[in-house]
Curated annotation (Swiss-Prot):
One of its GO terms (molecular function) is host cell surface receptor binding. A lipid is attached at C555, C562, C565 (S-palmitoyl cysteine). GO terms for biological process: clathrin-dependent endocytosis of virus by host cell; fusion of virus membrane with host endosome membrane; fusion of virus membrane with host plasma membrane; viral budding from plasma membrane; virion attachment to host cell. It is found in: Virion membrane; Host apical cell membrane. InterPro entries: Capsid_hemagglutn, Hemagglutn_HA1_a/b_dom_sf, Hemagglutn_influenz_A, Hemagglutn_influenz_A/B. The lineage of its organism: Viruses, Riboviria, Orthornavirae, Negarnaviricota, Polyploviricotina. Glycans are attached at N27, N28, N40, N104, N304, N498. This is Hemagglutinin. It is a single-pass type I membrane protein. The record marks R344, G345 as: Cleavage. Disulfide bonds join C21-C481, C59-C292, C72-C84, C107-C153, C296-C320, C488-C492. The chain crosses the membrane at residues 530-550. It comes from Influenza A virus (strain A/Swine/Wisconsin/1/1967 H1N1). The keyword Transmembrane applies.
Amino acid sequence: MKAILLVLLCTFAATNADTLCIGYHANNSTDTVDTVLEKNVTVTHSVNLLEDRHNGKLCKLGGIAPLHLGKCNIAGWILGNPECELLFTVSSWSYIVETSNSDNGTCYPGDFINYEELREQLSSVSSFERFEIFPKTSSWPNHETNKGVTASCPYAGANSFYRNLIWLVKKGSSYPKLSESYVNNKGKEVLVLWGIHHPPTSTDQQSLYQNADAYVFVGSSKYNRKFKPEIAARPKVRGQAGRMNYYWTLIEPGDTITFEATGNLVVPRYAFAMNRGSGSGIIISDAPVHDCNTKCQTPKGAINTSLPFQNIHPVTIGECPKYVKSTKLRMATGLRNIPSIQSRGLFGAIAGFIEGGWTGMIDGWYGYHHQNGQGSGYAADQKSTQNAIDGITNKVNSVIEKMNMQFTAVGKEFNNLEKRIENLNKKVDDGFLDVWTYNAELLVLLENERTLDFHDSNVKNLYEKVRSQLRNNAKEIGNGCFEFYHKCDDTCMESVKNGTYDYPKYSEESKLNREEIDGVKLESTRVYQILAIYSTVASSLVLLVSLGAISFWMCSNGSLQCRICI
């Protein structure tokens, strides 16, 4: 009975002791992040750095609508293909859109010289002034300006020609030498286009230009070239055995361009005074145009985001995140969100000495749970939580600011003869893209590792702060908890939490209780030893009596014979 009372006393004393535990916040978050050492670590809070959503629409950029070329391409639009007539009045745009079936380009067959370079030039133009550089009615009185039409460029069922060019042919039976100049007084670059016609036969050459040995000269301060028609039989394209090559140049302000010819010249009628804009570009997209606004446009759709990375499309126009190949870039801001003990990190992980987080503590990341005679409850440590929030917020903002270099990234133009250069360029671009992706992923992995270790150390520091105050006035019972050797009411608990715990005040009470508990433990140990000896002896006696009784019974009924020899 004495032993039982001692055991009950010990249990009662342990059960009624006041306790204080250090712990951390937990919630129902399913966010996962990757670190250098682990993948898919569940955390309480995180921020996404990778945009993977778009609206599937072509939108205005900065409030300015794009120029959608429809079934026309750049060549058809800038030369004035009759099928592109609806585009001729457009003078400004945010970016230019071609579609995958933009087939209306050069209606009269031939080569557009340096077409890819022209596209590059136009990709940085946001508006232009289309003006009549050589008026049709007054510039060419000695040449025919209305008969230069062709069935390959029809309009409304009749033969027609490019709206921005004039195909000059002989007037009557003569094609006198022409010489016309234009001085650029627009104060900006002027784009001028012209063409050279190459007939299939000498008969066609004479019927169109009269002069068998014709030439064309075009010159400015930066461009000088003499052309001779190449008369030769060729396979018909769009019903034409002849060919027409198209040329262009940029005239600087104050510069002069001169056209001199005795035949075969397709002269410019309209030219373009260009205004460049850094946010413009050319994209190929089949997405529909909508009345929406965005800061970043891709061929797949518009992106409205402040995130530093996107994996939607490498071609972008406007203020856009950097494209990476990653499928996930999530940065941890909160703590591990797991209920079981797992060791990890510089400090052995939060769960190295605390089993799991507290969903009941909702007003901070780190804090306390106490239990005493006045009740129990959770309380966050606001100072350490706020310091952690400030530090992590500054870090996240710094990462986003450093990586959020928004810019336009458009494709480069190469013609069919430059495939090797194009392939090399793609390899270089892919290499840069791989480096960007690797750097972004490594940065996130390292920062996630540091953040989780940072939280681990904060919980550890909070635990050490309490332990250093309590010293031997309480004992560590594991799982981040302390059991007081003295009564600790709510005021006492609060003093531990805010760092003002009065150790000497409770030392004497703690010493007495500690000695009493140690004495109870010692007496309990002695009683248990006596009980163990008693039970061993009693068990042996019962076993011997049982064996004797069985032997006597077996001898009495003859089942067992006993012989005693002397």
